[in-house]
């Protein structure tokens, strides 16, 4: 092989290597353009063991709710992907995500369902570059995943109500529905994904407050959905007054349903425990989620753009996706609120990725 042939071969290898990302990017962009033709939140779950899951214990050492690790015997829940009706969405491309958001800060703010989604995205990104150095730090307040090579940080700030929960010497813990005093922690991110709903329905020992307060009025109890609406409106006003849409893109993580009432899918007295397939059919047979309408109403009245990750209806179908007794707490805990990983939150992040491609 002479010099010119060697030079040509090296150039060919370089161009093929360079085009690799271009091909992926083109396919990703085509997928986004296709996705704009329909409502990506309407569709069905398709069993696909050729492409899902996107990661596993070997490619994500910090999974957390790894139900396989904790003894879940079935595996079908790992292989469902979301398919919108009438269009396709781009497959999640971790390298493309990291390249697009190089040097950026992504922030999840909310409860344990936000944490579920944060860990999912961190795993999806880590699996894309498994040999890259990373940091994964869990703290009571702010937890962070970073990949220094890309300068990206994906953060989770625990805040179950978004509004203030304060301690009072005489009354205990007061949930101040019209007050946000630590919103400065939410500033400075390029993408912010907020969530609250899960904690508002808690009762008994699970309830983390003693009183509600609005203005000077303090009450022991009130309608929970009314309290939720007041708090969410407080959050919406804070966003309208403090966020610059040219610097920060804001999303609201839609209400994540629980599956404690088997009567909703034809199994009275049962829960998510033992469920191995999604609900079949075009819609969930149970009653509408109370929080979903409130979220859409509040966001619809906002001055600043907030994009709703409208995942409630699609997630209602996944009665099979919860940890149940495979969350690490043994048979005493039947968790029908959170989600196994890999699993449903990966689809949420795929839809987040699809939405982010619009810029």
Curated annotation (Swiss-Prot):
**CC per GO annotation:** membrane
Q: Where do the TM regions start and end?
A: 7-25
Keywords from the named record = Membrane, Signal-anchor, Transmembrane, Transmembrane helix
Q: Where is this motif: GDS motif?
A: 110-112
Where is the protein found, in the record's own terms?
Membrane
Entry's Gene Ontology molecular function annotations: O-acetyltransferase activity
Asked whether the UniProt record includes Cell inner membrane among its keywords, one would answer no
> InterPro entries in the record, alphabetically?
TBL, TBL_C, TBL_N
Q: How does it sit in the membrane?
A: Single-pass type II membrane protein
Q: Motif (DCXHWCLPGXXDXWN motif) spans which residues?
A: 335-349
Q: Does Transport show up as a keyword for this record? A: no
Q: What does this protein do?
A: May act as a bridging protein that binds pectin and other cell wall polysaccharides. Probably involved in maintaining esterification of pectins. May be involved in the specific O-acetylation of cell wall polymers.
Q: Which family does it belong to?
A: Belongs to the PC-esterase family. TBL subfamily.
The miscellaneous annotation reads: Contains 2 motifs that are conserved in esterases, but it is unlikely that this protein belongs to the catalytically active pectin esterases.
Put simply, this protein is called Protein trichome birefringence-like 42
């Amino acid at each position: 092989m002479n010099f010119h042939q060697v030079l040509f071969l090296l150039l060919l290898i370089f161009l093929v290597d360079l085009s690799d990302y271009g091909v992926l990017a083109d396919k990703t962009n085509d997928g986004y353009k296709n996705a704009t033709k329909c409502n990506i939140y309407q569709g069905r779950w398709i069993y696909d063991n050729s492409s899902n899951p996107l990661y596993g214990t070997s490619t994500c050492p910090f999974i957390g709710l790894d139900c396989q690790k904790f003894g879940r015997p079935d595996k079908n829940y790992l292989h469902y992907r979301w398919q919108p009706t009438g269009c396709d969405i781009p497959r999640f491309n971790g390298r493309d995500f990291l390249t697009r958001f190089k040097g950026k800060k992504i922030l999840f703010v909310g409860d344990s369902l936000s944490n579920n989604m944060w860990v999912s995205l961190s795993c999806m990104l880590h699996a894309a570059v498994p040999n890259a150095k990373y940091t994964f730090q869990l703290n009571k307040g702010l937890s962070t995943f970073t990949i220094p090579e890309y300068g990206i940080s994906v953060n989770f700030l625990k805040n179950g109500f978004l509004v203030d929960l304060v301690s009072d010497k005489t009354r205990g813990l007061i949930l101040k529905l019209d007050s946000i005093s630590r919103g400065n922690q939410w500033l400075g991110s390029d993408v912010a994904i907020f969530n609250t709903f899960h904690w508002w329905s808690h009762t008994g020992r699970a309830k983390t407050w003693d009183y509600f307060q609005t203005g000077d009025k303090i009450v022991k109890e009130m309608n929970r959905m009314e309290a939720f609406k007041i708090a969410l409106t407080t959050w919406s006003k804070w966003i309208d007054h403090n966020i610059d849409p040219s610097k920060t893109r804001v999303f609201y993580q839609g209400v994540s349903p629980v599956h404690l009432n088997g009567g909703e899918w034809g199994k009275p007295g049962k829960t998510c425990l033992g469920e191995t397939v999604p609900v079949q059919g075009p819609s969930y047979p149970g009653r509408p989620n109370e929080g979903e309408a409130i979220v859409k109403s509040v966001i619809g009245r906002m001055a600043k753009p907030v994009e709703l990750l409208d995942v409630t209806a699609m997630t209602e179908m996944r009665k099979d996706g919860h940890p149940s007794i495979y969350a690490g707490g043994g048979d005493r805990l039947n968790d029908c609120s959170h989600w196994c990983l890999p699993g449903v939150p990966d689809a949420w992040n795929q839809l987040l990725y699809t939405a982010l491609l619009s810029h």
